[in-house]
Structure formats: structure tokens, C-alpha cells
Amino acid sequence: MDPDRQADIAALDATLTTVERVIDVDGLRGRIEQLEKDASDPQLWDDQARAQKVTSDLSHAQGELRRIEELRGRLEDLPVLYELAAEEGGSDEVAEADAELTKLREDIEAMEVRTLLSGEYDEREALVTIRSGAGGVDAADWAEMLMRMYIRWAEQHKYPVEVFDTSYAEEAGIKSATFAVHAPYAYGNLSVEQGTHRLVRISPFDNQNRRQTSFADVEVLPVTETTDHIEIPEGDVRVDVYRSSGPGGQSVNTTDSAVRLTHIPTGIVVTCQNEKSQLQNKVSAMRVLQAKLLERKRLEERAEMDALKGDGGSSWGNQMRSYVLHPYQMVKDLRTEYEVGNPSAVLDGDIDGFLEAGIRWRNRKDDE
């Protein structure tokens, strides 16, 4: 094997060793063992919420360990591939080994991103809200396309998704939607998606086939836990009930099961209509309200720190990504410069490259 390839393999070994140390592989195995014991408890399913969390955490931990062990095995096999290629003496065999080296580098770098998720709430599940912006019916349709994109991403990773509320627009699409992604580190990954997403395309709703620019806002919050101590006095919340509605304003429930919570001190309003009963909707809406109050508290603390440091802080608002379907095809992140020329794949949930680039960009900004 030539010195350059040896150096590449040594560098990958050093990176993977760092990943194994940061993730704590031995600790991960111990956590899996404990979760397996918890999952085998016959009384676990008496508490549905806890049971779902245990099984989700177990699946995620097992998958993470499996990926690390697979990367280590492939890295150990790589020198053997080059030895076999040298014995065969054929260019095809060398090219095959080089291709595996390139792919392994990409996979280890992707795993390395996981070690960058060290923020206070990065390990949490994520609560995502999408709102249509300027652009009329096209913007409502665009908001629904974004919702589908994130749900497809979660499905590809086998992450459970729970939709709390969907407010449908009159003609097509949605005014807004709120859903949770139930997976460890979902917040750390998806938090870089927060901001305004811009779509440029030939409008399917325009009889003259004119190009239309549409906007939608994405908000990502960490799901609250009991340790957050977000206490909401009963008198601070006004509860309104109404009938759930579907596309075009059509009623989808004959009872007043949908719930609207208004937090009187802050004016924050949360709705939930996707559960079957009023009680379930109220519980879900309260979870969303707690997450929004936690985020408000975090933003206030961050503003105080920025004032002490003498700077204005960084803004995640405004346009952060552009999706162009016409006159050319390109999805480009305006912060990281990462771009992909296949919008169809991106809109079908292939956003890992954007997430990885965003996480690396955020960490560089934090270090500045």
C-alpha cells in the first residue's frame, strides 16, 4: 500500500477513535443493557408514554452502537482490500478499494457530527412548527411540502412522528402544523433547520404558469422534560374548545374535541386537534406550551448574555435556505453554502447533508 493511502487510513482511525471516546462505547453498551432490562419489565406498558420512550431510546442506542461497530469493522478490513488488490495487480480492484476508502471517510465524518451535538438540549426530542408565509396559496402548499420533507426524513431514520395540530388553508396546503419527532438528538439535528425557507417554482395554481416565490417559517424547539421545572399556574391559561377541522374547513369531528390554550401572561397561543379526545388534545397542547415557554426562557437568558458580551447575538431568522425548481434546479443553504442539484431527493427527506453542514457551521460560529 502506498504511503498516501496508509496516511488516509491512519487519519480515519484517529477520527473514529475520537468518536468512540466521545460517545463512550462502553457506556453505550451499559445503557443498552439497562434499557433491555427496562423493556422486558412486564409492567412497563402500564405507562404508555414511558414504554414508548424506553423502546425508542433502546432502538436509537442499538442503532448507534451498530453503526460504530460497522465503521470499525470496515476500517479494519480496508488494508486487507488493498493487499488483495496488490496481489491481483488489477486497476479495478484498486479502484474498488479506493471507492470504499472514500465512502468510509464520508460515513466516519457523518458519525463525527454526532459528537458535535453537545448543547444543553441537543439530546432532546424535537418539536417542529411550520408556518406558511408570503406567497398566498403557493406558500400554504410550500409549508405542507416542508412538513412532508421532515416527516419523510424521520421515517427514513425510523423516528416516530406525532402530529399535534394541522391548520389547513382554504384552497390547498396548510397555514401551520406542529409535530414532534420522538428520537434522541432530534432537536440537536433539526435545530439548524430553524428559519425561513424560500421556494422558487412555476406555480401549479397560476393559469398563466408564472414563476412564483413562496416562503415558510420553520421553528424547532426541544421537548420539555420534568427536570425543566416549567410550572404553569392554572390561572395563567385560558382553555377554549372547538370542533376539529380538515382541508377546506371541513369538520372532521362531531364533538368539540379540539383545544386552544392561551398563556395569558405572554399571549402565546397553542392549538391541538389531532387527538381523539378533548383531554388528550389538552395534554398534548400543554406539552407544546411548555416547550414554547422553555424556549422563551432560553431566549431571554441568551439576550442577557449577549448584552453582557456587548454584541447583538446571532439571528436564525430571515432566509436560510433557497429551493429553486425553475429556471434551474438547486437547493442551497445560504449560511453554509452547502448545495444539492437534486431538489426532488431533498424534498423527499434527503436532508442529512444539510443537517451535517449546518451543525458544523453552528459549532464554528460558537467558537468564534
Swiss-Prot record:
<comment type="similarity">
    <text>Belongs to the prokaryotic/mitochondrial release factor family.</text>
</comment>
<dbReference type="GO" id="GO:0016149">
    <property type="term" value="F:translation release factor activity, codon specific"/>
</dbReference>
<keyword id="KW-0648">Protein biosynthesis</keyword>
<comment type="function">
    <text>Peptide chain release factor 2 directs the termination of translation in response to the peptide chain termination codons UGA and UAA.</text>
</comment>
<dbReference type="GO" id="GO:0005737">
    <property type="term" value="C:cytoplasm"/>
</dbReference>
<dbReference type="InterPro" id="IPR004374">
    <property type="entry name" value="PrfB"/>
</dbReference>
<dbReference type="InterPro" id="IPR045853">
    <property type="entry name" value="Pep_chain_release_fac_I_sf"/>
</dbReference>
<feature type="modified residue" description="N5-methylglutamine">
    <location>
        <position position="250"/>
    </location>
</feature>
<keyword id="KW-0963">Cytoplasm</keyword>
<dbReference type="Pfam" id="PF00472">
    <property type="entry name" value="RF-1"/>
</dbReference>
<dbReference type="InterPro" id="IPR005139">
    <property type="entry name" value="PCRF"/>
</dbReference>
<keyword id="KW-0488">Methylation</keyword>
<dbReference type="InterPro" id="IPR000352">
    <property type="entry name" value="Pep_chain_release_fac_I"/>
</dbReference>
<protein>
    <recommendedName>
        <fullName>Peptide chain release factor 2</fullName>
    </recommendedName>
</protein>
<dbReference type="Pfam" id="PF03462">
    <property type="entry name" value="PCRF"/>
</dbReference>
